[in-house]
């Protein structure tokens, strides 16, 4: 059975400022760096063998800290990027107009084709996240990979493994540097394929960020 660990990046400047990041970027805060060091300590205990990260700066920095603790190289995979939030990227969430807020909500309230102008849909996000996860099945036997990605992206992945549609209303909170785990199993008695073992574990963190943006 393959175990794959999923880690969201540490808190960023724009998380703290309540700005929409998407595939735009901002650096980790001092708190985010500390969170990354704490999740790195846990990752070392887990015996991680491979680290695969989104190629955005905030995930790369988080992955670098984890890799240093685990003694692993980092493979960058753009399929693990955050949802493309189109024209709303860099905007403060409290400054959105009613029309813009409706665009944002359509992504996650059951609207299959909802998307922000110049952005991508949750279905498109789900397809590339599942493709990245499936690549882990090609790793050598005995591997224990860790993927570093983003709040909406990981929430979409975990939710769809549980059988929810990609565009379902978001009811899964994955805080900065939380750890989730999904397992791939083949069984005559249990569900075959990917199953969720853990979601959003923050027991390794001193003070989880109260981040409502989840990205």
UniProtKB/Swiss-Prot annotation:
EC number per UniProt: 5.4.2.-
CDD domains: HP_PGM_like
A single GO molecular function term of this UniProt record: phosphoglycerate mutase activity
Active site: 9 (tele-phosphohistidine intermediate), 82 (proton donor/acceptor)
Keywords per UniProt: Glycolysis, Isomerase
Pathway info: Carbohydrate degradation; glycolysis; pyruvate from D-glyceraldehyde 3-phosphate: step 3/5
Site-annotated residues for Transition state stabilizer: 150
Catalytically driven reaction(s): (2R)-2-phosphoglycerate = (2R)-3-phosphoglycerate
SMART domains linked to this entry: PGAM
A cellular-component GO term for this protein: cytoplasm
Any matching Pfam family: His_Phos_1
Residues engaged in binding substrate: 8-15, 21-22, 58, 60, 82-85, 104-105, 151-152
GO BP, sorted A to Z: glycolytic process
PANTHER family named among the record's database cross-references: BROAD-SPECIFICITY PHOSPHATASE YOR283W-RELATED, HISTIDINE PHOSPHATASE FAMILY PROTEIN-RELATED
Family indicated by similarity: Belongs to the phosphoglycerate mutase family. GpmB subfamily.
Protein name: Probable phosphoglycerate mutase GpmB
Natural source organism: Escherichia fergusonii (strain ATCC 35469 / DSM 13698 / CCUG 18766 / IAM 14443 / JCM 21226 / LMG 7866 / NBRC 102419 / NCTC 12128 / CDC 0568-73)
